[in-house]
Amino acid sequence: MSSVVVVGTQWGDEGKGKITDFLSEHAEVVARYQGGNNAGHTIVFGGVKYKLHLIPSGIFYKEKICVIGNGLVVDPKALLEELKYLHDRGVSTDNLRVSNRAHVILPYHLKQDELEEASKGDDKIGTTKKGIGPAYMDKAARIGIRMADLLDREAFKEKLERNLAQKNRLFEKMYDTEGFSVEEIFEEYFEYGQQIAQYVCDTSVVLNDALDNNHRVLFEGAQGVMLDIDHGTYPFVTSSNPIAGGVTVGTGVGPAKVTRVVGVCKAYTSRVGDGPFPTELHDEIGHQIREVGREYGTTTGRPRRVGWFDSVVVRHARRVSGLTDLSLNSIDVLTGIPTLKICVAYKCDGKVIDEVPANLNILAKCEPVYEELPGWTEDITGVRSLDELPENARKYVERVSELTGIQLSMFSVGPDRNQTNIVRNVYEA
């Protein structure tokens, strides 16, 4: 039995999709365990670039089972659009499985998300307005509608009527806007469910059977540790648990069945949306990193905020996610910058802090303590091993591994699959 979890160690957008796609080649099952279509991942397969939001990266391999686990919230309309997107490009989706316990995003979740974000004014958290938060709220409040309900005409109608009575009062009384009628949603979304039905099953059985039969299973996280609802920069976070512990809850696989946890990070830092960002760059170097690294959101198209590598953040990710392996991406983006900086600690009110403060007022006051390293000018996009890296690039990579306390297993020098290099095999380590 070999199972590997891929976790983002920063604020998402670390290149998890590419690494998951790369590792998918040697897995028999690929599963997502949290989030929804608020996360985007870009995969290059057969020379073609694909952008996915819900469906796991392994979908391009016909012989591999791809799982949307119970921990996700699924917009049926968005899922069908993504299926069509793949079908139109000749990609089969017969290998997809969707949990019958996954919760469903409905139009009132999208409306609630938009209205709540608008009402916060300057205190907005930067939601993607995909209905993710409200769907997870309903799940916690035990009024959510699950895939199993969507496929049952009577159950779906009964729960939809109950929920709309509540949601419409919210829209009218709190936001002074009209809600929805049952007729506006019911038939359309029930039909969506019927189109998805062929994929729906108990995915916990699928995953545990695979592991019991010694198949390699790859668990694919969305977002990143710093967006985790418990361990991220709350409240500027997502509504689920991207940390490795989210796998057990979000797929129905016990923790003893997870063997390796790969932390994916960039050689610098980026984030979309609001919230504290200690190493953020507002200068010409920041602009250069953003343009060279094409730092614009896959889902939103928003320019990402960028900054120096923050080892405090990645050490935090190592601790709360139990990271065993490091995958360092986008090293090539730093080429040509004369002096590179790595944040090794924070300083606040004269005190040195080695961990991420839970209090955001304190985090906002934190000044990064930097260590400087010389940059490199050589083109590294064709490098295929650590030894081929220029001395300064190799020293930078090694220092990142030392400061984070995570053994380097993979590094990437460009966006293509063949620019990802293996230092050690995570399935056999």
UniProtKB/Swiss-Prot annotation:
Keywords from the UniProt entry: Cytoplasm, GTP-binding, Ligase, Magnesium, Metal-binding, Nucleotide-binding, Purine biosynthesis
EC number: 6.3.4.4
Residue sites binding IMP per the record: 13-16, 38-41, 128, 142, 223, 238, 302
A GO molecular-function annotation: GTP binding
Quaternary assembly: Homodimer.
Family stated for the protein in its record: Belongs to the adenylosuccinate synthetase family.
Protein name as annotated: Adenylosuccinate synthetase
Organism: Bacillus cereus (strain ZK / E33L)
